From Swiss-Prot:
Belongs to the insulin family. Gene3D superfamilies: Insulin-like. It is found in: Secreted. This is Prorelaxin H1. Its main location: secreted. Keywords: Cleavage on pair of basic residues, Disulfide bond, Hormone, Secreted, Signal. Prostate. Not expressed in placenta, decidua or ovary. Relaxin is an ovarian hormone that acts with estrogen to produce dilatation of the birth canal in many mammals. May be involved in remodeling of connective tissues during pregnancy, promoting growth of pubic ligaments and ripening of the cervix. Residues 56-158 form a propeptide. GO terms for cellular component: extracellular region. It comes from Homo sapiens.
Length: 185
């Protein structure tokens, strides 16, 4: 008899545990309709939760798959590559075949570095090069947004803010889930 009682007690505890998990997971799917400061406060509250709940949130949304090692590149290498590409485009005596190749694909950093000595052969000093870049950027600032996009000079911060603005507008006008707010933590 005591075994049967303990078995039923264990079964009851397991059912309560499953119910509490379902209730705890439900908060993520609650729809909230907030604007302005209230929305920012809710975002801070959601992002300020304990780390285990953030980890579980990210595991539910996107299963972890190992990325290939080739995709992991330090950001300073990408910036160096972009800088070298910009410099190579302004070199006057650079062969047109190389300029065409640069526009078609993204070359690797070591591949680009072999052409950097061409800067020494050109008549363009570093100060003149900086002045040329500044002039091009000021011309682009006067241009319309489509030309800015074409030149690649539109600001990075605007690109970063776009998803937030769209989400905040949606939360204010229609409503959004706490799960969607937690994705931007």
């Amino acid at each position: 008899m005591p075994r049967l009682f303990l078995f039923h007690l264990l079964e009851f505890c397991l059912l309560l545990n499953q119910f509490s998990r379902a209730v705890a997971a439900k908060w993520k799917d609650d729809v909230i309709k907030l604007c302005g400061r209230e929305l920012v406060r809710a975002q801070i509250a959601i992002c300020g939760m304990s780390t285990w709940s953030k980890r579980s949130l990210s595991q539910e949304d996107a299963p972890q798959t190992p990325r290939p090692v080739a995709e992991i590149v330090p950001s300073f290498i990408n910036k160096d590559t972009e800088t070298i590409i910009i410099m190579l485009e302004f070199i006057a005596n650079l062969p047109p075949e190389l300029k065409a190749a640069l526009s078609e694909r993204q070359p690797s950093l070591p591949e680009l570095q072999q052409y950097v000595p061409a800067l020494k052969d050109s008549n363009l000093s570093f100060e003149e090069f900086k002045k040329l870049i500044r002039n091009r950027q000021s011309e682009a600032a006067d241009s319309n947004p489509s030309e800015l996009k074409y030149l690649g000079l539109d600001t990075h911060s605007q690109k970063k803010r776009r998803p937030y603005v769209a989400l905040f507008e949606k939360c204010c006008l229609i409503g959004c889930t706490k799960r969607s707010l937690a994705k931007y933590c």
